[in-house]
Amino acid sequence: MDIERKIELIKKKPTEELLTEENLRHLLEVGAPLQHYIGFEISGYIHLGTGLMAGAKIADLQKAGVKTRIFLADWHSWINDKLGGDLEVIQKVALTYFKEGMKQSIKVMGGDPDKVEFVLASEILDKGDYWQTVIDISKNVTLARMLRSITIMGRQMGEAIDFAKLIYPAMQVADIFYQGVTIAHAGMDQRKAHVIAIEVAQKLKYHPLEWKGEKLKPVALHHHLLLGLQEPPVWPIESEEQFKELKTQMKMSKSKPYSAVFIHDSPEEIKQKLRKAFCPAREVKYNPVLDWAEYIIFREEPTEFTIHRPAKFGGDVTYTTFEELKKDFAEGKLHPLDLKNAVAEYLIELLKPVREYFEKHPEPLELMREIKITR
């Protein structure tokens, strides 16, 4: 596969940002090993924004010949008070429910879960030289910068935090260099940590990325954050700037069950959540149902997406591109309820293998149901 095709696959939806394409091209041209990683806190049920968005991108990366890795961030989850801040529980969930859920998500999005390496953070944090890397990074970043970066944890700037949380951004950056990662992957909400990684890359003494005597910068790949199904905290949204400010609050959240569809939700739960979804008629800019259609259903174009309607409401209609769907919705030719029902049916069918897996292997899900889910 040539370099242009590899770049095309890596940039494909749901990629929203690549820092930078020039650096990626350089890594490909010099023949540097392409090692991907995406790190996850272990914090509750896997929703589509985690499972399907990451799974889709992992599938693309595999097709481009990249080695893929999922980093199960148990210590980071402990620092961020996930699952009651119980490290033992976090580790148990990471190696059962979360690992299996991500494998099934990757599979339904066209990837090969057997080609994904799963690494528990404890496996590398127990090594003494990991902490040398954390200190090395910390010496190259100001305290003010670290404080601004705590938003990667879902925390607000200015929020009262314990000191452990200040170590978190440096640990996340260290994870990249210590594992020899050349493609650091996450949702757009993790951007601040990745920018630090790029900026300190050529200053590090411990575990820098090196290839044939050259210190390399990692590529940061950020995928789209699916909008939550709930109404935005402010409506109407007056400007693109206001939308950017609200976007993190509008993303799917496992602590707000009706904002998210989980990978193992029943058909009835999926229908119910989509029925309640915020989907104003003719609204195409800030519409979570259209957002899901664009990034899940129309990730590959052309495709065939059929909306079934009674003849008196126009009968069945099939769309092959997202722009066709968006245009009809904007012009009022497609009713919100018809769109919601069709998206629900698509998701029910897409997630069927995941449901079947957890029906045959119920123990991981039963474990999750017994555990208090924290934000």
From Swiss-Prot:
Keywords: Aminoacyl-tRNA synthetase, ATP-binding, Cytoplasm, Ligase, Nucleotide-binding, Protein biosynthesis. The keyword Acetylation does not apply. A motif ('KMSKS' region) lies at residues 251-255. Its EC number is 6.1.1.1. L-tyrosine binds at residues 37, 168, 172, 175, 190. It is an enzyme of class 6 (ligase). GO terms for molecular function: ATP binding; tyrosine-tRNA ligase activity. It is found in: Cytoplasm. ATP binds at residue 254. It catalyses: tRNA(Tyr) + L-tyrosine + ATP = L-tyrosyl-tRNA(Tyr) + AMP + diphosphate + H(+). Belongs to the class-I aminoacyl-tRNA synthetase family. TyrS type 4 subfamily. Catalyzes the attachment of tyrosine to tRNA(Tyr) in a two-step reaction: tyrosine is first activated by ATP to form Tyr-AMP and then transferred to the acceptor end of tRNA(Tyr). PANTHER family: TYROSINE--TRNA LIGASE, CYTOPLASMIC (PTHR46264:SF4), TYROSINE-TRNA LIGASE (PTHR46264). Homodimer. This is Tyrosine--tRNA ligase. It comes from Thermococcus kodakarensis (strain ATCC BAA-918 / JCM 12380 / KOD1) (Pyrococcus kodakaraensis (strain KOD1)). The lineage of its organism: Archaea, Methanobacteriati, Methanobacteriota, Thermococci, Thermococcales.
